[in-house]
């Protein structure tokens, strides 16, 4: 009876928590080996996981410590496996790597020294005793800090830069060869036919007169012809040069210059061609261009400067009608009164004696001849009228106006 009343005492390690001990005792199987004489009693339990760790993060080059976190009575036997299912052993590691990579510590600890990027993965701990077996898996993650990827990216950048430089150098070489060929073609062109075209253009440019306020519209028209001729030669020269289409159209440039200067508008307003035998219209100023000033039929199509001094074929001069001044009007009235008095005196004399009529007619003829001689004295300014009857409309139309008729050449 004294044996039944005796209390059981169990020695527990101080590092195990009290709660874990209670749970272990509740689930463990009690094994009692006793005799009738009251022999000793031995207790044990299956392995259990006291803490679970999902993953561990370690930088490359550092050491990693992985705990199995298993407990059991009696003491457990630990084995570690990597992600490919290989059993990790210190003896094998010493033979393969020279030792020191894998270290199996007491309490189910796995120490990995000098972790590399290839050591990443899952590690499984298998703990077992006479009562059972349990396993725990921990994932090891390695932070890549090695310079291998930096070297890789550097190599990629260097290769890309080399390719770009090769392409640029090739393009520059092609452009240089093209420019050399173009320069050679230009030099060859100007040594042969280009020199002749430049000489012709230079000769035309030398003949272009300078327009001033004292020049006439015919000279302006000649200047326009010469300038357009020079532009045509320059355009032909530019088109014949073996270059890409980078040279602008010279004719377009010259036309823009003409529009700015206003020569084209002046030529349209003041210069026009009048057919021969046709009277000029009633305008302020009408000029015709002689054929000698037009473009000739020569191969170079240039006109002579001496053609400016030739007489035009037809010039239409305006007929101006303007009022007389007061002094001229008084003189005309006095002259008309004198003529009327002379006519009145001659009429009675003719009635009385026909012989006395002859001196009066002589006086009138002398007056007429004196009137005719006045325009002859200045032949340089204008030509005299063909008949005296042309002056009669000036008297009959209006006494206050003077009409001047000028003939056509």
Curated annotation (Swiss-Prot):
Chief localization: membrane
Signal peptide: 1-28
TM regions (residue ranges): 149-169
Residue spans of biased composition, Polar residues class: 362-372
UniProt keyword annotations, A-Z: Cell membrane, Cytoplasm, Disulfide bond, Glycoprotein, Immunoglobulin domain, Membrane, Nucleus, Phosphoprotein, Signal, Transmembrane, Transmembrane helix
This protein's name: Microfibrillar-associated protein 3-like
Phosphoserine, modified sites: 298, 303, 306-307
Function: May participate in the nuclear signaling of EGFR and MAPK1/ERK2.
Keyword Methyltransferase attached: no
Gene Ontology cellular component terms for the protein in this record: cell junction; cytoplasm; nucleoplasm; nucleus; plasma membrane
Top-level taxonomy: Eukaryota, Metazoa, Chordata, Craniata, Vertebrata
Source organism of the structure: Rattus norvegicus
Family matches, as InterPro entries: Ig-like_dom (IPR007110), Ig-like_dom_sf (IPR036179), Ig-like_fold (IPR013783), Ig_sub (IPR003599), Ig_sub2 (IPR003598)
Ranges facing Extracellular side: 29-148
Side of membrane Cytoplasmic, spans: 170-409
